[in-house]
Amino acid sequence: MENCRNIFNISARHGWSVSMENMDGIQFLNFKRKTSSGVPFCFTIEAGDGTAGCIAKEIFSFVSAVVPEQCAREWMIQSGAMEPTEFLQAVADMEDVRLRAWLLALELAAMNARYNVLDTIPWDRLN
């Protein structure tokens, strides 16, 4: 993987712990951190060609797929949580995770001059 140490260092600087996994010859990266309320969270991406640009693109894809309210509902169903404040905290946690993943992807994208950072902005979600 291109600049593997740089990718891991940048991830750590953004609060993510990263591990690599090989399944049937395909490289995957697991990103882990605790949410702002202390709940463990992780997501996994395929490393593709291993370049910072490819990894950034996969993270941007994850970020664009995350819908905080939907994730909070799923978490409440799985955990058995019932309080409205728990739902609001779960939504806030997912918004924070999405933001932190997006910031990580921006910095990784900046490592790759061929990657257009403007393509990563979710224009349809901006007010």
Predicted stretch roles:
Residues 1-35, 96, 104, 111-125:
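Negatively charged, low-complexity tracts enriched in Asp/Glu with abundant Ser/Thr
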Residues 6, 10, 58, 71-75, ...:
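Charge-rich, solvent-exposed alpha-helical interaction surfaces
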Residues 23, 29-32, 48, 60, ...:
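Intrinsically disordered, low-complexity regions of eukaryotic proteins
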Residues 36-90:
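Intrinsically disordered, low-complexity regulatory segments enriched in Ser/Thr/Pro
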Residues 43, 80, 99, 124-127:
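Residue-level signal for functionally critical sites in structured catalytic/ligand-binding pockets
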